Amino acid sequence: LGSTLAEIWSREAWGKWSYVDDDLLKPHNVVRHIGKDCHIGKSKVDVVKELVDLNYHSGEKSIAIHAKINDSENPQVKEAIDNAELLVDVTTSIETARDLPTLANLTRIVSTFITPSGEDAVLLFEDKYQKIRVDALETQYYRAILNNDWGVKHLKKHLGAFKTGGGCRDISMVISDELIKL
């Protein structure tokens, strides 16, 4: 989802972006990532930077930082967070979602993700004055799932407690590429 958003926003010439991720592009990522087979083994952020910077010769060039976004000791990460007007969290890491409000205390955060079926998307966006931080919005989101009729279908195709790892390393689902781009 993150690379797709980067591609869309780049084509729209929206924003000057710093991409932060410590992951490498793996063969199973190519199905949904903008990276291609020839990029396997490379840093995901380097691949995203390379591809989105090709969209406009004279456009804003992005910055790629191969690190964890919650690595508060990394000077590049700290600078990227401190200089950001908006921090878009598209990670699948619960740890990251919990750390960002304290690391980005002056930077507005938006968190976005898709549900297991790929049929629903979620956008948690802090208000202009950050009266309600993204971690509190996430709690409200979970409460809404439990307390509304739509919550029953919202997480359909979730595999329950059977997991093989964490975040995007969980068991893969077959999701149409069109759903990712919608």
Could you describe each region identified by the protein language model?
Residues 4, 68, 72-85:
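C-terminal structured domains
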Residues 19, 27-30, 41, 97-100, ...:
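Extended hydrophobic-aromatic, low-complexity segments
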Residues 2-3, 25-28, 69-73, 95-97, ...:
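Flexible loop/turn segments at secondary-structure boundaries
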Residues 22-60:
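Glycine-rich phosphate-binding loop and adjoining beta1-alpha1-beta2 segment
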Residues 82-86, 90-182:
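Glycine-rich phosphate/adenylate-binding loop
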Residues 1, 20-21, 67, 88-92, ...:
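Short His-Asn-centered micro-motif
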Residues 1-24:
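Glycine-rich adenosine-cofactor-binding loop
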Residues 53-76:
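S-adenosyl-L-methionine
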